[in-house]
Amino acid sequence: MTHSVQLKILDKRLGSEFPLPAYATTGSAGLDLRACLDEPLKIEPDETCLISTGLAIYLGHSNVAATILPRSGLGHKHGIVLGNLVGLIDSDYQGPLMVSCWNRGKEPYTINPGDRIAQLVVLPILKAQFAVVEEFELTERGAGGFGSSGQN
């Protein structure tokens, strides 16, 4: 399934010096977002920096949203994760896409201009329509909380 997304290039290096967002493989769910920096940016341990991706998107339909997610290698190898853990882009947002990068590692980490820093995933959205009830239908799990379904 595909969905047309309007893309506005805010940094002219995108498409020339830096590739436009693209799926790395046919099975990729996320499009890589790049750091549109003028110079390398050193992020000290426990520091958070807001980094421009150089683009804005408009999803255009209320049944679609996008998320900005971390790149697994940056988090696992270098401790670089998203400062807000996940970014939610509503269908009617038209502003610039920014990435909050947090260095939760023990060493400084340098992000260079054009580095892949996050990924954008476009998702279908179902609008909830609440039905107020006195009791829920019985399920096997019931109201069991954290850890109630076991480890296996």
Curated annotation (Swiss-Prot):
Pathway involvement of the protein, from the record: Pyrimidine metabolism; dUMP biosynthesis; dUMP from dCTP (dUTP route): step 2/2
UniProt-listed Enzyme Commission number(s): 3.6.1.23
Cofactor(s) essential for the protein: Mg(2+)
GO molecular function term, any single one: magnesium ion binding
One BP annotation, GO: dUTP catabolic process
Keyword annotations from UniProtKB, A to Z: Hydrolase, Magnesium, Metal-binding, Nucleotide metabolism
Chemical reaction(s) catalysed: dUTP + H2O = dUMP + diphosphate + H(+)
Highest taxon listed in the record's lineage: Bacteria
Main enzyme class: hydrolase
Residues the entry annotates as binding substrate: R71, S72, G73, N84, L88, I89, D90, M98
PANTHER family with a match to the protein in the record: DEOXYURIDINE 5'-TRIPHOSPHATE NUCLEOTIDOHYDROLASE
Family to which the UniProt record says this protein belongs: Belongs to the dUTPase family.
Function text: This enzyme is involved in nucleotide metabolism: it produces dUMP, the immediate precursor of thymidine nucleotides and it decreases the intracellular concentration of dUTP so that uracil cannot be incorporated into DNA.
The protein, known as: Deoxyuridine 5'-triphosphate nucleotidohydrolase
Organism: Coxiella burnetii (strain RSA 493 / Nine Mile phase I)
